[in-house]
Amino acid sequence: MSVRVGVNGFGRIGRVFARTALRDKDIEVVGVNDLADAKTLAHLLKHDSVHGGLKAEVTAKDGAIFVDGREIRVTAVKDPASLPWTELAVDVVIESTGVFRDTATASKHLQAGAKKVVITAPAKDPDVTIVLGVNEQAYDPKKHRILSNASCTTNCLATTVKVIDDAFGLRRGFATTVHAYTNDQPVHDFPHKDLRRARAAAVSMIPTTTGAATAVGLVLPKLKGKLDGIAIRVPTANVSVVDLVAELEKPVTIQAVNDAFREASAGRLRGILDTCEEELVSVDFNGNSHSSIVDLPSTALIEGNLVKVLAWYDNEWGYSSRLRDLVRFIGKTL
């Protein structure tokens, strides 16, 4: 029996998640809530500037989107507590507005009839934060109703760091994410509380903050306080890369580090972490569903235990693929 899903906020992540879910027989997207109308949302689902056209018939009629004949009810309700999740028999809500990121507000979906809520961002006081491949064993279906899927960068970094720490022990590290621009940046200069993010997204490299490195401690508690990082937003529409420099507990070789990633990608992290032997660039990873793709030719080492690792990630498709997988994971115990 498929998991019935409602999506609150049909922006970049909401729509890309829907694309991944439409391919999955175990998930049925039955409702979308967004302040835009059904015709506009259907158009944006069908035509995507980053991921191309959806290979399906997509239409809008009578307050609904139809994808190859499958109906997705569309509403435009501001208060999540008033959403028709009971009527639609929704099991899991994808909370992707970027607005309802704490337990108090996200729990309104539960009041509306949903069984579980997954917040598509780092959240304030969720029941649990899950990064698949890292700490899914922490999920307790009897206790946890509001989950965070962390961020795209945390999914990449935590997955990468776990391999290093498990194999060699991580003493401390610093991560720089070179990140594609996102919708919270303006096309032209425009006021923003972060003065650097106030600048035109497609013109400059923009240093800014990221909580991804410190958030690793939420899913790998033993590394709490051992990682920090920054972000540099760059003028590309999609695909990002984490540059991790870490001090290890014991001496290693480049071969040993790369072999650890090869082994993980072929084993316990298959489908979540991948490796790349070719000398590729960001556009080559557009549409890649992995949380982390380690760039093996770029691995570097100083004095035996200071290692540099580059890990690519499609910050839209890879992250949305983990959302899909998390919904399936939750669905097993509903």
Where are the regions a protein language model picked out?
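Acidic, glycine-rich segments within the central catalytic cores of soluble metabolic enzymes
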Residues: D166, L170-A237
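N-terminal Rossmann-like NAD(P) cofactor-binding subdomain of oxidoreductases
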Residues: M1-A198, L301, D325, K332-L334
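Short clusters of hydrophobic/aromatic residues that line enzyme substrate/ligand-binding pockets
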Residues: I65, I130-L132, I146, H188, ...
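Generic secondary-structure signature for well-ordered alpha-helical cores
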Residues: L22-D26, K162-L170, A180-N183, T210, ...
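Short, solvent-exposed beta-strand edge segments and adjacent coil->beta transition regions
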Residues: K143-H144, A200-A202, V239-D243, L306-K308
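C-terminal active-site/capping subdomain that shapes the small-molecule cofactor and substrate pocket
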Residues: G229, V241, V245-L334
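Predominant activation on well-ordered alpha-helical scaffold segments within soluble catalytic domains
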Residues: G14, A18, S107, A158-D165, ...
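Conserved active-site and cofactor/substrate-binding residues in soluble primary-metabolism enzymes
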Residues: N8, K39, L88, A104, ...
